[in-house]
């Protein structure tokens, strides 16, 4: 019998779009901000994952069209079939290494499980300046559309960047 995460369990009971957010730092802030923007935009959105009420509870009690999920590496490790339409990877730095036999590459792989089941119709938004993310993407293939963001440089193709204190997109 496979051991799955609560996220993997709950997704079986909803057809909602999910936005999954992970990273070593800034998950909660990014998740709350994303939820707030979607809610203020008039969308029927729920907030769950590693924040607030569990995703399973939300799915059982509410019928949201979209769920914004904060996802820890622990939750991502229990993913088998779950995928989100939009994955956001803030950054990766050495954290929880005791769980990964003190092997940073195992932790990085855990964070990239957020892309595991994505297709060409999905999106990965990621920090284009994060060395661990850049190295992993150079050596691995994902199916999702890659959308980098940067506070320093303008992405070559599609993405977001900071210029003259304004966030812009290409």
Q: Model regions: which residues?
A:
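Adenine nucleotide phosphate-binding catalytic loops in nucleotide-utilizing enzymes
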Residues: 101-108, 143-170
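Phosphate-binding loop of NTP-binding sites
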Residues: 2-144
């Amino acid at each position: 019998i496979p051991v799955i995460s609560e996220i993997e369990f709950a997704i079986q009971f909803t057809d909602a779009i999910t936005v999954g957010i992970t990273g070593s730092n800034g998950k909660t802030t990014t998740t709350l901000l994303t939820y707030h923007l979607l809610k203020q935009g008039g969308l029927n959105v729920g907030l769950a994952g590693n924040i607030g009420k569990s995703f399973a509870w939300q799915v059982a009690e509410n019928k949201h069209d979209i769920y914004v999920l904060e996802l820890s590496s622990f939750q991502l490790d229990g993913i088998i079939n779950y995928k989100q339409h939009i994955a956001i990877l803030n950054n990766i730095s050495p954290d929880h290494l005791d769980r990964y036999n003190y092997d940073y590459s195992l932790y990085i792989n855990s964070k990239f499980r957020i892309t595991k089941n994505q297709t060409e119709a999905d999106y990965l938004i990621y920090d284009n300046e994060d060395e661990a993310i850049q190295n992993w993407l150079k050596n691995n293939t994902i199916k999702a559309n890659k959308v980098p963001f940067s506070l320093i440089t303008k992405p070559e193709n599609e993405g977001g960047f900071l210029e003259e204190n304004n966030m812009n997109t290409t």
